[in-house]
């Protein structure tokens, strides 16, 4: 079937209705995922993007654009066929309205419209509509622009033609009339715990889609910041380029990834695999562009074929005989990075989250194609094949050595009744769910922790010095490390693929407690590397935590208080600074106590907005512009200029303001020298400017003129939020002695209990992995053998580093 024929058949009669959106609003988690942790929020974008990608899979689209708008909404555009706009016979309204308002409506139920698809078209976009405060739909089809608006899932305007579609100016269809769909939506605050999109989370998924669909260009833009950001995601190499991207911080054993492509029994397979010199496997599986975290029939088929082909080659080449080892499946996958993508007409998954593929017809197709492709490659590349199999044989030898070491340890443990490490101060509680273990840096801190702990349910394990970097060590070498052996024994869950059992771990809270200096951060990173590489299930189950000892101790007279970080320190200084203070406003009103504290909190939020915008203009100019209403809906340049005069000193001329081509321009003469300030449109449309404008509505009346802040015998002139925050913080510091902690050893047992061990008062950070491939890349870059990726990381993040010297 040609593209033209397919386009002709995709009309109103392609849309099948199966009804109702109320269920979505009542039980959003069933349709979109968790509405509290951000996964459901980002899934809203994925649902719309998946529709655009499905157009690309069907051969009708080449470009997708995702924009995070300054007002918090998202726009997704594609240059596909455009949603059908003709009337739907069964529903009596346009097909576009059916798709957007009926739960089970779409073109994915009709094999003529889409051969394969990631999800059910109408389900996804109608759910997005139901869970949005508003959604605007723009369709280019039949040479016309069609527009429609929805609020809370209901149409508030009918689909109407608003103009003619423009002509394409670039790409393979240049000169033709533009077709495509644009969806802009604002997620509902009533449904989601927060509605701010995370750029990195979206970028990760969009990059995956660009790799999996070579030839499709995805433009990702973020217009929320002062400096607009954009990235073009386009990879001609497809999943071969994906594997290279995943392995960019590792040393490859082959010049290029092995690629296997083919179609068998309507199952399309696209595979790329590449061995490197690391000791860890990285495997990503996709079905119709959807990732399977738990694998499934495609993964088991690939592994079976890989093990069979490699074992066969190792035997026929004589390498097995020479090395005197027997190969296992895990040996073949040591140092392997692989991306496996299958396209299946009607995939079946084990659950609604689609984390595991269970379609039985996929297994023989994948196994057959992989066996055939790998056999051919091994025959055509004998030297590289030999290098791979030699590495695998070495892995098998190391595995055997590690097995013998474990057997010795087991026998020793069986004979030794007190097999727990001598340094471990264990707890009396035997229920793992109630037990905690603190892994402490050094013997001195370990001694304090042992005295401070609650012996009923808190164990302490001090580790001296830096533990082995397991990223650069093979399994047998790792087992020979005393510190790692101590850690493994204390946890009681075993180690290695065959012996590790997370159900046997003796503590369900494993807390890393290191100093707040560079050495402490390094030791914590080494421990995290160990847990991520050797016991990832403990991270997945949420058992690993990082202790947050206080950073500061603030003392005044005989009283003292511990403060965990800079934010808590600032909050404490504000409380101190407001205590006994008063603010006399220009209106004659006086603010004190809770009213003043609430005002200062609002001013701190406004200051945070101003600080982020200050890269483009002076902070005081932004502040006074906001207070004049310049960032709101009715900007007045003259009013903003008048407010700027509050900062004028003797000899300064008055400010004047006007609207220029690219923003507002303010100028004055200061001691004979012309001065000019520009608040450009980029700043005016930034998300922080919008939030600042909302806060300024409340602040404008309070700061109508110069105010006076008084505390004890000192008074300060206040012209806006910036002056007030600085005056309060200065007042709060007066008479305080502030001590900064760097090591746990600096605290005595009582202090350690009060700040870090007491479950009622402490702060713990739970370690979680959102994207395994990103985590894998980060550990490889920072902890691996290659120096260049580490240098690049330092250069990229140097400005964000906070280093205590």
Curated annotation (Swiss-Prot):
The keyword DNA-binding applies. Its EC number is 5.6.2.2. Mg(2+) 1 binds at residues 441, 515. Mg(2+) 2 binds at residues 515, 517. InterPro entries: DNA_gyrase_B_C, GyrB, GyrB_hook, HATPase_C_sf, Ribosomal_Su5_D2-typ_SF, Ribsml_uS5_D2-typ_fold_subgr, Topo_IIA, Topo_IIA-like_dom_sf. Induction: Transcription is induced just prior to the onset of DNA replication, at the swarmer-to-stalked-cell transition, lasts through the stalked-cell phase and then decreases in the predivisional cell. It is an enzyme of class 5 (isomerase). Keywords: ATP-binding, Cytoplasm, DNA-binding, Isomerase, Magnesium, Metal-binding, Nucleotide-binding, Topoisomerase. It is found in: Cytoplasm. Few gyrases are as efficient as E.coli at forming negative supercoils. Not all organisms have 2 type II topoisomerases; in organisms with a single type II topoisomerase this enzyme also has to decatenate newly replicated chromosomes. This protein may be 16 amino acids longer at the N-terminus, in which case it would overlap with the stop codon for recF, the upstream gene, with which is might be translationally coupled. Belongs to the type II topoisomerase GyrB family. This is DNA gyrase subunit B. It comes from Caulobacter vibrioides (strain NA1000 / CB15N).
